[in-house]
Every structure is written in C-alpha cells, then in structure tokens.
Amino acid sequence: MNYLFFDIECANCYNGKGKIYSFGYLICDHNFKIKTPPCDILINPDCKFDPYVKKNILAYPKEVIKASPKFNEAYEEIKQLMTAKNTICFGYGIDNDLHFLADDCKRYSLEKIQARVYDVQKLIALALDRPARKLVIEYTELVGEEEKGTHKSDVDALRTMLVAKSIFVKDNKPIHKYFKD
C-alpha cells in the first residue's frame, strides 16, 4: 500500500473558486519509507494573484509560476498520482484542497478526480481522541520540530506525512485502518 500526501496552494479564491498554482506531494509506503521525495507540480493559474497570496504565501517567483503549464496540462499527472493502484491519498484539512481540485476540473471541463482520500486532521481526532489544530501546531507538538515559516505545498505535504507518521509510530497501526470506507 502506498500513501500519497498532498497539499494545494491557490493564486486566489475569488467568487469561491480556487485557482491552483501548486500541487505538492510525496509518496511513501504504509511504513512511511519515502518512495518519491517531496515535489511541487507548479501550475500557471491563468488568473490574478490575490495580493495577500503574492505578499505572504507565494514561495516561487511569479514568473516561474506564469511559465508553468496550466491545470489542464498538469491534470493527467495529478490524476495518475491520486488514482494509482494501491494508493491512498492524505492531506490536512483537505476539504478545501478537494474543493480546489473540483473547481479547476470544472473550470477546464475535465472529469473530477475520484480518489481515495483521508484527512490527517481527522486522523488526529480519531487516534488521539481530541480535536485537531492547525498543521503547524500539530507538526511542532507531534513531530517535535519548529515550523520554519515556509508556505510551500511540498513542505506542507511532508509535514502532514510526518504528523501521520508520529501517530503510526505511537500506535504501530497503519493509518488508513483508522478510517471506515
């Protein structure tokens, strides 16, 4: 069984629709041995960046993002990653990320990506029997490392994996077993 941890960043969410500029991910096995190191698929969102995103979140030069393929060109790679055989996807607070994927699929008239996806934020609630907090807080507390202030989707995917791994190490139970399909 492979686990794909992912995170998404958007240029803006104007009119309630996310426009993706970064899909960060890593792949590991169910024992958390990394098979594919953290990677960002950069995407030209073909829209204006929210001023807040430009100032506080954008981790790449805008020119690099604008020179990247549009979502419809990156779609097959993302879909293949998320729907690969024996792969379960995980994110942190993933409702927004899944909404952003659906928004861009609709925007480009592409089929919605149907993947098996679980939320590590909910895993914390199930495994530790308490409400989960923001990723940076859980990362600092459960992993024991200080957050460095970056806002890259590949880094957030790695942090999400490390939080999930800390629960696996504690309970010695595959994390997907906490969830009922």
Report the location of each language-model feature.
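Conserved non-catalytic scaffold segment of RNase H-like nuclease domains
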Residues: 2-102, 114, 137-143, 151
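Active-site flanking residues adjacent to catalytic metal/cofactor-binding acidic residues
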Residues: 6, 118, 155
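Hydrophobic positions within alpha-helical membrane elements
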Residues: 12-14, 124, 161
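Short, function-defining helix-loop hinge/capping sites that tune catalysis or transport
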Residues: 15-17, 105, 127, 164
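N-terminal cationic-hydrophobic initiation segments that often serve targeting/anchoring roles
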Residues: 79-82, 109, 168
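Acidic, Mg2+-coordinating catalytic module of metal-dependent nucleases/exonucleases
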Residues: 88-95, 100-105, 134-181
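Short hydrophobic/aromatic-enriched beta-strand-loop microsegments
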Residues: 111-118
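Short alpha-helix plus adjacent loop in nuclease-associated cores
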Residues: 118-133
